[in-house]
């Protein structure tokens, strides 16, 4: 009997109807497995213009849900911050000349013509001569590919060429790159007290300086704490491009000077490595798996992601609310806040995100609250009704402006954030987590 039954089953397997049924059953089984998987999988798209702080939001998620950063990552950030600190001080010295700010390190006695403070002047020269590439220890940084790419911006080419390399296209503001480089060379030599020869190759400043990290750190600290012109220039940093955490670097410069220094959490939150392309990060939060896609915010990066995402649970859009008076790194003719408004308008009303809820982070609120005391919002937004120093009215004004861009019925949730503040971000990210899990359950048909 067993043999007969076996033969019958074998013959049935050749029946096209049975084969089709089994194929359909297998497809349905796979679909059900995918549905079960998707109901616990949350996809977040992290977007925003360049310098908005979205990568800092991602760092907070790593701290809260992934156990933080590896030893290698902490070493890498130490190298990056050290290089940025040197470049930031060099930027302040150069920009002081362009803005007509007199530095204490350049003051001379009216009668003798001698420098009033020789030590300060030597500190300034030391910063100019420091070769940033020489300050990077690839071994201590782990020799990582991302770090090697990062330090390419310190290869000595002009600022215009740096931007062109970053963006992949030339700026069309009428400026001549060679002329701009000549201007920088002139300023460099003038500030250093040497005569301008017209050739940066023979410039005194092009000598490779072999100063130790401790000597360079001392020079930075001396200029930061004792040269009033440097502070005055820093207070006008919205008029040029300066690393957002420069003051933090300067205040802590001695620890970053140590080649074996291991960055703590706050150092990493303050440090910055530009996001290029799209990175995917996974976090296990309760029964759910969060997949967070962090996309580069500079203009040249956006075409890589603006149409690439389907099935996104929610979009987290980060806006640096404090940058209402600053210009883009990649195009110094365009206001950063204006750029964020245009970008948000495009995304909110894009067919790719027609039914996707948005979560807005009004980021860098702490900086905004201080900045509005000295930089009028009305200069850039003439319709702003508030007074100088009224941060609450300013926040409400921008929040209303962003919400008015929504021409659909999609939900928008707004949070005021300081992405470097772990305690406040713990609360905000907790609320966001609960929200997107609820949205995902609705999307899966469970709620």
From Swiss-Prot:
Subunit text: G proteins are composed of 3 units; alpha, beta and gamma. The alpha chain contains the guanine nucleotide binding site.
Positions that bind GTP: 51-56, 269, 275, 297, 363-364, 366, 419
Region (G3 motif): 290-299
Transmembrane segments: none
GO molecular function, a single term: GTP binding
Chain coiled-coil ranges: none
An example Gene Ontology CC term for this record: cytoplasm
Lipidation positions, renumbered (S-palmitoyl cysteine): 3
Magnesium among keywords: yes
Residues in G-alpha domain copies: 40-447
Name the UniProt record assigns to this protein: Guanine nucleotide-binding protein alpha-1 subunit
Gene name in the database record: GPA1
Keyword field contains Isomerase: no
Residues covalently joined to lipid (N-myristoyl glycine): 2
Organism: Kluyveromyces lactis (strain ATCC 8585 / CBS 2359 / DSM 70799 / NBRC 1267 / NRRL Y-1140 / WM37)
GO biological process, one term: G protein-coupled receptor signaling pathway
Entry function: Guanine nucleotide-binding proteins (G proteins) are involved as modulators or transducers in various transmembrane signaling systems. This protein is involved in the mating response pathway.
Region listing for G5 motif, in residue ranges: 417-422
Region (G1 motif): 43-56
List of residues binding Mg(2+): 55, 275
Cofactor(s) essential for the protein: Mg(2+)
């Amino acid at each position: 009997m067993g043999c007969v039954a076996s033969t019958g089953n074998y013959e049935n397997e050749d029946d096209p109807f049975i084969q089709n049924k089994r194929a359909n059953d297998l497809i349905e089984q796979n679909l059900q497995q995918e549905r079960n998987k998707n109901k616990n999988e949350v996809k977040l798209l992290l977007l925003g213009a360049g310098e908005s702080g979205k990568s800092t939001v991602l760092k907070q998620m790593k701290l809260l849900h992934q156990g933080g950063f590896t030893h290698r990552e902490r070493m890498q950030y130490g190298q990056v911050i050290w290089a940025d600190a040197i470049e930031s001080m060099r930027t302040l010295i150069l920009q002081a000349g362009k803005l007509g700010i007199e530095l204490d390190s350049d003051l001379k006695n009216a009668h003798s013509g001698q420098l009033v403070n020789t030590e300060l002047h030597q500190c300034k020269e030391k910063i100019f001569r420091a070769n940033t590439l020489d300050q990077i220890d690839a071994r201590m940084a782990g020799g990582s590919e991302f770090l090697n790419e990062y330090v390419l911006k310190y290869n000595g080419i002009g600022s215009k060429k740096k931007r062109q390399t970053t963006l992949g296209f030339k700026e069309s503001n009428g400026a001549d790159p060679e002329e701009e480089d000549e201007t920088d060379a002139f300023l460099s030599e003038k500030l250093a007290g040497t005569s301008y020869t017209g050739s940066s190759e023979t410039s005194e400043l092009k000598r490779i300086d072999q100063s130790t990290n401790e000597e360079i750190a001392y020079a930075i600290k001396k200029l930061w704490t004792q040269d009033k012109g440097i502070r005055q220039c820093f207070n006008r940093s919205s008029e040029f491009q300066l690393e957002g955490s420069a003051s933090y670097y300067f205040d802590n410069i001695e620890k970053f000077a140590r080649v074996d220094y291991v960055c703590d959490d706050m150092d990493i939150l303050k440090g910055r490595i530009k996001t290029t392309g799209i990175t995917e990060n996974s976090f296990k939060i309760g029964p759910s798996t969060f997949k967070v896609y962090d996309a580069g915010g500079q203009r040249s990066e956006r075409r890589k992601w603006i149409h690439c995402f389907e099935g996104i649970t929610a979009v987290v859009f980060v806006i640096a609310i404090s940058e209402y008076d600053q210009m883009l790194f990649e195009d110094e003719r365009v206001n950063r806040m204006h750029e964020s408004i245009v970008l948000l308008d495009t995304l909110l009303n894009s067919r790719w995100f027609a039914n996707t809820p948005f979560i807005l982070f009004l980021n860098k609120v702490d900086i905004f609250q201080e900045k509005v005391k000295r930089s009028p919002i009305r200069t850039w937004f003439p319709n702003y009704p508030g007074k100088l120093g009224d941060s609450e009215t300013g926040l409400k004004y921008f929040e209303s402006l962003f919400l008015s861009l929504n021409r659909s019925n999609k939900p928008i949730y707004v949070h005021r954030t300081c992405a470097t503040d772990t305690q406040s971000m713990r609360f905000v990210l907790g609320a966001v987590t609960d929200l997107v899990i609820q949205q995902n359950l609705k999307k899966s048909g469970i709620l």
